[in-house]
Regions:
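Phosphoinositide-binding peripheral membrane targeting modules
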Residues: 11-18, 23-66
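Short, surface-exposed polybasic-and-hydrophobic patches located at secondary-structure transitions
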Residues: 3, 60-76
Length: 93
């Protein structure tokens, strides 16, 4: 199951890009050259996800992904409901 979601990473501003979901990883990608290489192609193994929470930033839908080793990443995701459904399927299959 490969899915693509339009998303922005909330890290030192709002960094537009996309989240790619496959059966093993969530990968956030942006083409902004002013962003650290770490965040231009941020790969998060699904097995390392501890928690996914949803919320809002102003009126935008957000998702916070908490990983092992105290890493947390907040994203604005425009199809949040579908993203959460996809993640629920992957994490519990």
């Amino acid at each position: 199951m490969d899915e693509i979601f339009i998303a922005s990473l909330c890290k030192n501003g709002i960094l537009g890009g996309a989240i790619y979901v496959d059966k093993n990883h969530i990968t956030y990608r942006t083409n902004k050259l002013t962003v650290s290489e770490k965040y231009r192609n941020l790969k998060m193994p699904i097995k390392d996800i501890i928690e996914i929470t949803s919320g809002r930033m102003l009126f935008f839908p957000t998702v916070t992904i908490s990983l092992k080793h105290d890493y947390k990443y907040k994203f604005i995701i425009f199809n949040k409901k579908k993203f959460l459904s996809t993640m629920n399927e992957l994490r519990h299959s």
